[in-house]
Amino acid sequence: MENIIIQNQEKFDEKLKVIVSGGIDKLHVRMDFDGTITKAIVGGKIVPSLISVLRDEDFLGADYSQKAHALYNKYHAIEIDPVVSVADKKIAMRKWWETHFDLLIEKGFSKCHIQRALQSARIRLRDGFGEFAAMLVKNKIPLVIMSCSGMGVDMIKMVLEKNNVLFDNMRIVTNQYEWNDDGVAIAVKEPIVHTLNKDEESIRRIPDAYKTIKNRPNVLLLTDSVADITMADGAKIGTLLSFGFLNSNIDKQLGAFEKNFDAVLLNDAPMNFPKDILKNVCGK
């Protein structure tokens, strides 16, 4: 338990009791992808996202990498600035994603680049995710993966498939490219999903995803970002039990994580604790 902080044990236990009482038929799970399903630290270095692999490993040339890093430096500063309003941040995030997608298309981003990025040793699933995902599918509990990935739904599916954890109980809410016959990206479909609009509305836009969860009011929510607590905004939630993976800058971010999450998991922790909670719910 040394990597787990539960600020209010009584509240945590009360929520868990309600979820267990409701049973698996009333439960679904919502997870972020980058830094939650994937490991955030590989070989001692931070891997913030799938798109960072494309950006850092020079697959699209030096000009792309330079411009992509410049966009990150400009807009990430706005994203984490406590003085900037949420409304202004949402405008900035939309602009960041639009500009980056335009840059990717300009540089000829294709499915071949996804295949190359997929081979990167920096893309690894969080320890224990496979067992967690297998338990969900065995008990017919839906998993909604909510991601603002710049690599799109194709990359996420390929990562899961490569690791033999792409299951039919999963629904992926993220960005989608339009490809030409040669597998080259020519556009991005609306709506664009960015860091600050991953919410219930984004699920409702995908009828198949919403259908699987609409009668399952209890939620386990797992993410590595305080901003992602909004992944349940707008939903008719019964009981929400949230897990925050605090992977880096612990001293700086711990207070915010403790305030927003029922449980905080430190240092790129494995999935052991969420697995134990799920076993409890499933009666295992």
Predicted regions and their residues:
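Alpha-helical substrate-recognition element adjacent to the catalytic core
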Residues: 1-181, 259-261
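C-terminal cap/substrate-recognition subdomain and adjoining C-terminal extension
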Residues: 1-3, 12, 120-145, 149-284
